[in-house]
Amino acid sequence: MEPSAEDGGATSSSRAEKGEPPRDPVEQARAICLRLLTGTPRTRRQLADALRKREIPEEAAEEVLSRFEEVGLINDGAFAQAWVESRHHGRGLARRALARELRTKGVEAALIDVAVSQLDTEQEEETARDLVARKLRATRGLDRDKRLRRLAGMLARKGYSEGMALRVVRQALEEEGEDTEHLGDEGF
């Protein structure tokens, strides 16, 4: 095919094949979003922030993001569900910590509520018990109060409520033969 005046003298190969960035803002936005989505799922806000950072015009960004939502390349609800599943089972995070992480990623409150509701209290408490059981041996040799503070603090950092953290840690210490009768309820 002969280069024509209409396409600026270029051959039929695309800019992407030549490694040139697209000149049209919509093409640029599309290329940026596809590249970002290739590595890992992203929320709409994460992609919008990336486009804004690269100075893509708002109209072009909105057009591409809306189209990607239409075809299912961006789905904040599915992202939130997968995030909760992964982070709860992988890191043992509680609903509160998961909701906080999703908020920072720009997921809407209603979608966060749906995603974290898949974890029930029993499941959350079982995960807390597993986390404490894994860390319990490392605290042997420390005095009882210090063990309680360390283990309950670890759970608190993972988003567990103070009440659940203290209950789970006390139970684990009792099962190990520690006297927890005189431990106060005033927190850690």
From Swiss-Prot:
UniProt keyword annotation of Acetylation present: no
Main location: cytoplasm
Any one cellular-component term (Gene Ontology): cytoplasm
Ranges for region Disordered: 1-28
Highest taxon of source: Bacteria
GO annotation, biological process: regulation of DNA repair
Compartment(s) where it occurs, according to its Swiss-Prot or TrEMBL record: Cytoplasm
Gene3D superfamilies linked to this entry: Winged helix-like DNA-binding domain superfamily/Winged helix DNA-binding domain
InterPro entries noted in UniProt: RecX_HTH_1st (IPR053926), RecX_HTH_2nd (IPR053924), RecX_HTH_3rd (IPR053925), Regulatory_RecX (IPR003783), WH-like_DNA-bd_sf (IPR036388)
Biased composition (Basic and acidic residues): 15-27
UniProt keywords, alphabetically: Cytoplasm
Coiled-coil residue spans: none
Iron among keywords: no
One Pfam family recorded for the sequence: RecX_HTH3
Function, as annotated: Modulates RecA activity.
Family in the record: Belongs to the RecX family.
The protein's name in its UniProt record: Regulatory protein RecX
UniProt organism field: Streptomyces lividans
Taxonomic placement: Bacteria, Bacillati, Actinomycetota, Actinomycetes, Kitasatosporales
Gene name per UniProt: recX
